[in-house]
Amino acid sequence: WGALGHATVAYVAQHYVSPEAASWAQGILGSSSSSYLASIASWADEYRLTSAGKWSASLHFIDAEDNPPTNCNVDYERDCGSSGCSISAIANYTQRVSDSSLSSENHAEALRFLVHFIGDMTQPLHDEAYAVGGNKINVTFDGYHDNLHSDWDTYMPQKLIGGHALSDAESWAKTLVQNIESGNYTAQAIGWIKGDNISEPITTATRWASDANALVCTVVMPHGAAALQTGDLYPTYYDSVIDTIELQIAKGGYRLANWINEIHGSEIAK
């Protein structure tokens, strides 16, 4: 996701993080701000663009070597790669964020990575190898020539919300939380975190990746890539996917909160 999506994931998470876990996370991040997760949600994207951080680029995705739209699947052993992927990163930073042998800066970095990667995993094209996760599928959206990946990350969410400031994200998150509390997500939200377990991070994160990857076949490119490269993706394609984008942002926030609550719970139990 882009800045708007990541901040919205973080604001949704802030709603569901327990007060005790919130204090713990604020302590790690050195922030008592009401945007303590949202304000650092895109740090990992900024970091990977620096010379010091370019090593981390592969951690933002897992390249599922499947065959959309005919066949979508994730295989951790097949797809992760020697330089690591989102799944291995979530496992690593889940361990590091509460490793007492590491420095407070290591803990803060680990939490910043977790906030970002758990969000990225719900963007279907971050769980797909085809055309570099859609980066090489050149399309037209709302009169602009861009690529399918950036439309999913940034331009379709911004079209829905109308901006990408923290205030826009906070407002979107409130709507998504309402949908979780008493709307069309209420019945399904418990399923978003079913079986999630910080002691089984590879299994859990692989399930998250598989959940989003399946949408590449059913929602992102159900008729293949070529079908998306004629005409403008707005409004017909946009209308067909925007509900899924909202759902995936909500999922990311709900899962992130549960993950932080679990990590904090395991800290207390030590």
UniProtKB/Swiss-Prot annotation:
Residue numbers binding substrate: 1-6, 45-51, 60-63, 73-78
Entry keyword set: Disulfide bond, Endonuclease, Glycoprotein, Hydrolase, Metal-binding, Nuclease, Secreted, Zinc
Glycan attachment sites: N92, N138, N184, N197
Site note Important for catalytic activity, residues: D45, R48
Residue numbers binding a divalent metal cation 3: W1, H6, D120
Gene Ontology CC terms: extracellular region
Signal sequence, renumbered to the chain: none
Endoplasmic reticulum listed as a keyword: no
Family statement drawn from the similarity comment of this UniProt entry: Belongs to the nuclease type I family.
Name of this protein: Nuclease P1
